[in-house]
Amino acid sequence: MDTTPLTPLTKGITLYQHILSQQALNPDATGEFSGLMVQISLAAKLISRQLAQAGLVENVLGFTGETNVQGEAVRHLDQYANETFIRVFQNTNLVCLLVSEELEDPLPLSNQCPIGSYALVIDPVDGSSNIDVNVSVASIFSVQRRNPRATDETSSLLQKGTGQVAAGYVLYGPNTMFVYTSSQGVHGFTLDAGLGEFVLSHPNIRIPERGDYYSINDAYSAEWQPGTRAFIDYLKQAKSRGEKAYSARYIGSLAADVHRTLLTGGIFLYPGTVAKPKGKLRLLYEAQPLALIAEQAGGKASTGTERILDIEPKTLHQRVPLVIGSPYEVDLAVAFARGEKQTVVAGS
């Protein structure tokens, strides 16, 4: 029998064991954060089980007929996932407030909210339009401590991304994978359906310094700002400069595209356009958590002109452009966006 002591990065340990091992390293830990992470993983298991029945049972595919705060048609899966997160945290006193893509205002989840208590910020199902065609989707989350100096619930959550306690996503694909950081590296856990547990499969994920792939929706190229267009043209002409050619990859599911970029290197872009320079992705529950993961893995995340984690949100559902991935490609994209690099010349 192997009696080697478990550490937080022992491959094959469960997410629960990992969290408890991390907690043991902090003498001031109360167990609240550990409990919170376990409940997120429970929500993920429930959503994963529901997704596995898509097409076999009612109210997984298709629309509810309602419209959310974003002005988007609500899908059954969006509604189920949102209600699942609410259900697993309600009356636990682990989370005081829940912010969701599906809710206009913060939702109080506990009557007992001491100063500094946690808030959970989520996109319950990112890329839900893809489930009808059996493409990967994800839940994205961010854990914050409420600002005790704030005068109301909303302003208590409008914090820079550097203040996140933890961030992560659960990718529902060929398998279900829980990826998170609490600013101690990025770790990935794969759901073992037989055990019903997330098991450490990708300890200490590091993004390559430079990659071979770029990911962007080329259908919007006519609407890109000049810096974005010049950057993508530059990548496309790598071979003419005697460099290794880049390949394009685009799933159309944000967390899935970022996950691939995290593992293989390169860059993902969801830029602003001439008509919508402020972009489409939401800062608090899409850009901020993914940016923290990228930076903890050695990558970078920017709007094209500003570091994502330095942005102070003005509203709960604020939108931003997103450029995220390997340091080399992100720095290059930023140089083009700022006009510091403007021309594409063979051999440059």
UniProtKB/Swiss-Prot annotation:
Positions of Mg(2+) 1 binding: 101, 123, 125
Classification via Gene3D superfamilies: 3.40.190.80, Fructose-1,6-Bisphosphatase, subunit A, domain 1
Source organism, top-level taxon: Bacteria
Catalysed reactions, as listed in the record: beta-D-fructose 1,6-bisphosphate + H2O = beta-D-fructose 6-phosphate + phosphate
Binding annotation for Mg(2+) 2: 123, 126, 286
CC cofactor note: Binds 2 magnesium ions per subunit.
GO biological process terms on file: fructose 1,6-bisphosphate metabolic process; fructose 6-phosphate metabolic process; fructose metabolic process; gluconeogenesis; reductive pentose-phosphate cycle
Compartments reported by the entry: Cytoplasm
Cofactor section: Mg(2+)
CDD domains listed in its UniProt record: FBPase
A GO molecular-function annotation: magnesium ion binding
Membrane-spanning residues: none
Coiled coil: none
GO cellular component term of the entry, any: cytoplasm
A Pfam family that the UniProt record links to this protein: FBPase
Enzyme Commission no: 3.1.3.11
Principal localisation: cytoplasm
Pathway assigned to this chain's UniProt record: Carbohydrate biosynthesis; Calvin cycle
Amino acids binding substrate: 126-129, 217, 250, 280
Keyword entries, A-Z: Calvin cycle, Carbohydrate metabolism, Cytoplasm, Hydrolase, Magnesium, Metal-binding
rRNA-binding found in the keyword field: no
Subunit details: Homotetramer.
Family classification: Belongs to the FBPase class 1 family.
Protein name: Fructose-1,6-bisphosphatase class 1
Organism: Gloeobacter violaceus (strain ATCC 29082 / PCC 7421)
